[in-house]
Amino acid sequence: MSANYMRLLCLMACCLSICLAYGPVRPIVNRYGRGRVIDVVKPVDTAEAQAAALTNAAGAAAASAKLDGANWYALNRYGWEQGRPLLSKPYGPLDKLYAAALPPRSFVAEIDPVFKKSNYGGLYGDKTITLNTGAKLAVSVA
């Protein structure tokens, strides 16, 4: 998610809360004098829902930013070495798919520095991986 998308989302939430807070809500009266019952939603009732929506959007943005810095090939290789494949595919960033699957109010913890992308270049699916461990370590995949 980009910064412009987050700004638009916050602006939309603010406009919605203003409209709900100050919008005129009157019972509809027909020509016979009987009014229908209208369910009035007050701003106090929607504050929690608005806070949850903004928190979910912030969680998705944080998760996307952290996942962009991950080396998916190294994560997948590590999973196979541990005997538990992580099923991460080297298709590229999966941040939109991951953000859509986030449970409410969840945040991704900091990704281990070992699995971040190399500063020396390298794309998804390269044969040589340089891990950011502070030491000069390269793993060659045959």
Swiss-Prot record:
The keyword Signal applies. It is found in: Secreted. Belongs to the chorion protein S16 family. Disulfide bonds: none annotated. This is Chorion protein S16. GO terms for cellular component: egg chorion; extracellular region. It comes from Drosophila grimshawi. Residues 1-21 form the signal peptide. GO terms for biological process: chorion-containing eggshell formation; dorsal appendage formation. Chorion membrane (egg shell) protein; plays a role in protecting the egg from the environment. Keywords: Secreted, Signal. It comes from the Eukaryota. Its main location: secreted.
